[in-house]
Swiss-Prot record:
Prevents the cell division inhibition by proteins MinC and MinD at internal division sites while permitting inhibition at polar sites. This ensures cell division at the proper site by restricting the formation of a division septum at the midpoint of the long axis of the cell. It comes from Parasynechococcus marenigrum (strain WH8102). This is Cell division topological specificity factor. The lineage of its organism: Bacteria, Bacillati, Cyanobacteriota, Cyanophyceae, Synechococcales. It comes from the Bacteria. GO terms for biological process: cell division; regulation of division septum assembly.
């Protein structure tokens, strides 16, 4: 999530449909390039959330684990808002 995305979210602005479509396309391309099937990605998300939850309380409703591609490099990105440490 970029700073602009955060500002837009705080101000209640809706993303442009072109931006949404671009993000979805990037996600599809990232999945294709990584050769990870959706079931494996879901399992990874659950396990990442489980491990992080052992150390800090996270906001699951706002958290996100996704694949992002930039300059032909795919990264697994976890954006997990921390409520407090345990």
């Amino acid at each position: 999530m970029t700073l602009q995305d955060l500002i837009d979210k705080l101000l209640g602005r809706q993303p442009a449909s072109a931006d949404t479509a671009r993000q979805r396309l990037q996600l599809v391309l990232a999945h294709d390039r990584s050769d990870l099937n959706p079931e494996l990605l879901d399992q990874m998300r659950r396990e990442i959330l489980e491990v992080v939850s052992r150390y800090v309380e996270i906001d699951l409703s706002e958290g996100d684990v996704s694949l992002e591609t930039e300059d032909r490099v795919t990264a697994l990105v976890a954006n997990l808002p921390i409520r407090r440490t345990l």
